Amino acid sequence: MSHPINVFSEIGKLKTVMLHRPGKELENLMPDYLERLLFDDIPFLEKAQAEHDAFAELLRSKDIEVVYLEDLAAEALINEEVRRQFIDQFLEEANIRSESAKEKVRELMLEIDDNEELIQKAIAGIQKQELPKYEQEFLTDMVEADYPFIIDPMPNLYFTRDNFATMGHGISLNHMYSVTRQRETIFGQYIFDYHPRFAGKEVPRVYDRSESTRIEGGDELILSKEVVAIGISQRTDAASIEKIARNIFEQKLGFKNILAFDIGEHRKFMHLDTVFTMIDYDKFTIHPEIEGGLVVYSITEKADGDIQITKEKDTLDNILCKYLHLDNVQLIRCGAGNLTAAAREQWNDGSNTLAIAPGEVVVYDRNTITNKALEEAGVKLNYIPGSELVRGRGGPRCMSMPLYREDL
């Protein structure tokens, strides 16, 4: 592989993918603090891990290399200097107000000799009771005395799609919607700065976690070697799309058109890929609830290097035909178009498919009506269980970050 990253489509045969196996961070979820951590329910860890292992094994059975974020992050801590730098940065972004408490956490983390154990600890979160003689020094600490964590867990991390996104040979290292998830992007920073697989190699960055406006990978879809679709959503700002479009054009990644899909700000469809995914050259899943009010903007580069933004005035299928150079496209509706089934199965990520080859996808087995519609459209389905993983509000695409796809 001349480039460590090669993603010029949503559907090219998947060769390498990054996952995160859920761990103790899920056991640090508590009913009183679910909203703070962007969860609606508490998955049963043992079952969630079994479901995730089934997902990984299915991918391996298709000759796909599976790498884990936690392993790459541990391997990126290549020496003691980088290791200490990681700990210092992690603590600076952990919102610990008390300097003495921060120093106790630093000592705790420095005492962990094994890098993989250190990464797992950073992901799981740290409870106040783990610190010797924890003292409340600030009014905020006293008001939040009942809150059990000095560092919040990262239960959303098994959705590896979001904290960065691969584009062509490059990446978008994202600025996340919430403080809870922003720390997740530290792992991506160290992986791409220091891991031997990527360090010193051509991996251009079209967005950086230090930017002031938010964007998440669930809103970033690579429709072709010329077209990127990005959702304007609960998690991604329009301003971020302008920034990333300029960077994509300036860095000559090969993409000529950025399509911005305005899907509104809703928890139930927080990202574009929860309501729209590409599954074949001319086939797409879509949640019918977004169709009526969907507005699409095209962003192109002008001759002077500035960007041109145009509001598209056609139907979604015609817009897709225009930019993907197709005669026809097929929009396969979640729930087969039935409003009740569509709402239920979209909530359970029926639209969130992962294409592993043109016309072949991974889906949750629970979304029976949508799955039947996909099969009737000639799509090959690979089923995984999802009774626990889905409680985090994400499906197969959310849980995977392609690092390498074959070109179409």
Swiss-Prot record:
One of its GO terms (molecular function) is arginine deiminase activity. Coiled coil: none annotated. Pathway: Amino-acid degradation; L-arginine degradation via ADI pathway; carbamoyl phosphate from L-arginine: step 1/2. InterPro entries: Arg_deiminase. It is found in: Cytoplasm. Belongs to the arginine deiminase family. This is Arginine deiminase.
